[in-house]
């Protein structure tokens, strides 16, 4: 049976409202911070309280079980006879007071394993393996402040020691030969599409309400965009921040938003990469359980929705630590893991290796890291993942003006590359690729207001043209659906 795709729109960078909490510290001085610090949850659940006093907390009203995978921040804590208690915000919403014992303290969390392909032209930065680091209060510390016994690993396996204050950890970084992993580009390109132009740079428009004329308010009606048989319908309006907003976090680790770069959807779990700046290579992954989050609109208003609704949403939204994501546009996922090609989009081409991250969906932490190369003088900017052992990559060969499609298959820690197709032309002459995915035997390549459908061998099939005038920030194919993320 011939399979067709239905389009689904994921819209990002919308408004999250303001909520002012009324929970108090009574008769005790609080240690306050000018800007919020980021806290890292532990594995044990603790009660959350309305109030604290010198004698301890009172007014228990909920548990941390709903919030431990969210973005947790705080601007103050108090010392009581029962220990320190922190006044926490979760995903940008004021929640209440919790014991400092809830946070993981004096801890360095690292990837479970790292396998580096031997390459004298590239050195793996060992701090890229850090999930998070915490001090004695459970406050997150910037990975750059961690001392390492070796900053880079390139051609020989090494055990690297990490330390910050009382926190210590070590990691064996394996270097494999990479023999037989790289492929050769030897396929004849298929005829391509007629080249078109589009607008360049940032979005030229916005959703209905996210503009000055409507005072940057939340969306209340969905969108439908049609082209050449492809129909895109809104599935979710994301919150602008999944944290406190502009200027409220003490550093880049705290703010989750506002720049989306890539998406992946698998089994109803939608994940996007979020950055504070387009120049950052570290950021956060945010996962939404669409099986539980049925509303298209409610997630925009995490800070103002009913408390019972917020608890449910908080349990179904997960935020990763502040980790290396590279450009963050190339994502994929399986039932258990999220995959990221953590490449450098400012590096045009050359002999450098690239990083693949495997991140657990369960706790949003890095499980494995591999570095790889697909072929001589080919650096990948766009990729997608199918299951746990397959990556498809897109490479634009400027010298020959064609796109190459590569399949990388994992066996153990080796990623073996094979060219599977090629297409003549650049498709859009004045805009970079904004999204790339694979589904039902076809590649989908997104540019601003354009999506191209290409057979696995490079056969040009369909060109979808839109007039949305908002940046596409990632594509993902899952089942019969094609998911498209629009900014603004």
What are these regions (language model features)?
Residues 1-28:
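Sec-dependent N-terminal signal peptides of Gram-positive bacterial secreted proteins and lipoproteins
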Residues 29-87:
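Beta-loop motif signature
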Residues 31-54, 106-140:
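Solvent-exposed, low-complexity, repeat-rich "mucin-like" stalks and linkers
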Residues 89-107:
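Boundary regions of SH3-family modules and the immediately adjacent low-complexity/disordered segments
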Residues 137-180:
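Serine/threonine-rich, repeat-prone extracellular segments and beta-strand-based repeat modules
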Residues 185-254, 266-316, 351:
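Beta-propeller domains
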Residues 255-262, 323-330, 373-388, 426-437, ...:
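Repeated scaffold domains used in trafficking and secretory/extracellular systems
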Residues 278-297, 346-358, 399-410, 448-455, ...:
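Structural motif
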């Amino acid at each position: 049976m011939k399979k067709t795709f239905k389009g689904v729109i994921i819209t990002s960078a919308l408004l999250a409202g303001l909520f002012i909490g009324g929970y108090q510290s009574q008769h005790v001085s609080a240690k306050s911070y000018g800007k919020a610090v980021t806290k890292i949850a532990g594995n044990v659940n603790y009660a959350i309280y309305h109030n604290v006093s010198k004698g301890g907390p009172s007014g228990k009203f909920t548990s941390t079980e709903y919030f431990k995978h969210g973005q947790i921040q705080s601007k103050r804590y108090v010392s009581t006879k029962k220990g320190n208690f922190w006044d926490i915000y979760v995903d940008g919403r004021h929640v209440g007071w919790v014991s400092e014992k809830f946070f993981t303290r004096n801890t360095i969390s690292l990837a479970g394993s790292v396998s580096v392909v031997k390459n004298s032209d590239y050195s793996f930065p060992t701090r890229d393996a850090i999930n998070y680091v915490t001090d004695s209060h459970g406050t997150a510390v910037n990975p750059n402040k961690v001392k390492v016994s070796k900053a880079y690993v390139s051609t020989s396996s090494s055990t690297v020691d990490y330390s910050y204050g009382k926190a210590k950890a070590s990691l064996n970084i394996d270097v494999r030969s990479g023999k037989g992993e790289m492929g050769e580009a030897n396929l004849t390109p298929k005829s391509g599409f007629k080249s078109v132009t589009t607008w360049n740079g940032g979005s030229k428009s916005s959703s209905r309400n996210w503009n000055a004329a409507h005072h940057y308010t939340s969306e209340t009606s969905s969108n439908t965009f049609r082209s050449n048989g492809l129909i895109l319908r809104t599935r979710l309006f994301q919150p602008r921040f999944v944290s406190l907003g502009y200027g409220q976090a003490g550093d880049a680790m705290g703010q989750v938003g506002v720049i989306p770069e890539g998406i992946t959807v698998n089994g109803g779990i939608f994940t996007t990469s979020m950055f504070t700046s387009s120049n950052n290579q570290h950021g956060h992954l945010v996962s939404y359980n669409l099986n539980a989050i049925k509303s298209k609109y409610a997630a925009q208003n995490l800070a103002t929705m009913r408390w019972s609704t917020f608890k449910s949403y908080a349990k179904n939204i997960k935020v990763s630590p502040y980790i290396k994501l590279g450009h963050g546009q190339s994502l994929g996922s399986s039932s258990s893991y999220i995959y990221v090609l953590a490449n450098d989009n400012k590096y045009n081409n050359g002999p450098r290796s690239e990083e693949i991250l495997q991140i657990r969906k369960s706790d949003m932490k890095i499980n494995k890291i591999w570095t790889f190369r697909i072929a001589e003088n080919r650096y990948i900017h766009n990729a997608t993942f199918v299951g746990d052992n397959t990556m498809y990559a897109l490479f634009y060969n400027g010298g020959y003006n064609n796109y190459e499609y590569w399949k990388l298959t994992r066996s153990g820690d080796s990623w073996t590359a094979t060219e599977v197709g090629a297409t003549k032309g650049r498709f859009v002459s004045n805009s970079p690729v904004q999204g790339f995915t694979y589904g039902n035997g076809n590649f989908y390549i997104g540019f601003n207001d354009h999506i191209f459908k290409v057979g696995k061998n490079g056969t040009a099939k369909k060109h979808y043209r839109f007039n949305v005038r908002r940046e596409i920030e990632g594509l993902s194919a899952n089942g019969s659906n094609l998911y498209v993320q629009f900014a603004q």
